[in-house]
Amino acid sequence: MATKSTSKPLLLSFLMMSYLISTFHVITVAEGRTLQFTKMATDHSGAGNLMDCWNAGLELKSCTDEIVKFFLSQTGTSEPPVKGGIDKDCCGAIGLVVKDCWSVMFTSLGLTTMEGNNLREYCEFQAEKSELSPSPAPETLALSPVEITYPGLDY
């Protein structure tokens, strides 16, 4: 059996090693949690704040008629959708959801990710189309000639 004088340093070194191992474990777990949190933030893209995303979701809900008509008008070909299509407000909400919020929000409307991508592509195409189309010429105002006479002045 070990003497009393050798058991103290042995006990002290055992406690010191236990402390170091537990500290290392806590640091590793804390760093792992930070990395996991960062990964979750990048999955969400993080640029949109909660209120913007919430408002975009509400806008999407109010656009369901337009979205349903859009998908019903698609026949799997390159034919244009029904006249009117999806308006700028709905396209703005779709763009915000795809780029800055959770694209999973489309599932709240019963849409798949592929359908969400189709909506995004349509809205991007409409935005490009409106940028490329020339703006209408301003209307000119045609005035009829008026004869002005001044009393007392004869020419």
UniProtKB/Swiss-Prot annotation:
Restricted to female reproductive tissues, specifically accumulating in storage vesicles of the unfertilized egg cell. It comes from the Eukaryota. It holds the Pfam family Prolamin_like. InterPro entries: EC11-15, Prolamin-like. It is found in: Cytoplasmic vesicle; Secreted. One of its GO terms (cellular component) is vesicle. Residues 1-32 form the signal peptide. The keyword Secreted applies. Keywords: Cytoplasmic vesicle, Fertilization, Secreted, Signal. One of its GO terms (biological process) is regulation of protein localization to cell surface. Belongs to the plant egg cell-secreted peptide family. Involved in the regulation of gamete interactions during the double fertilization and to prevent multiple-pollen tube attraction; mediates the redistribution of the gamete fusogen HAP2/GCS1 to the cell surface after secretion upon sperm arrival. This is Egg cell-secreted protein 1.5. It comes from Arabidopsis thaliana. The gene is EC1.5.
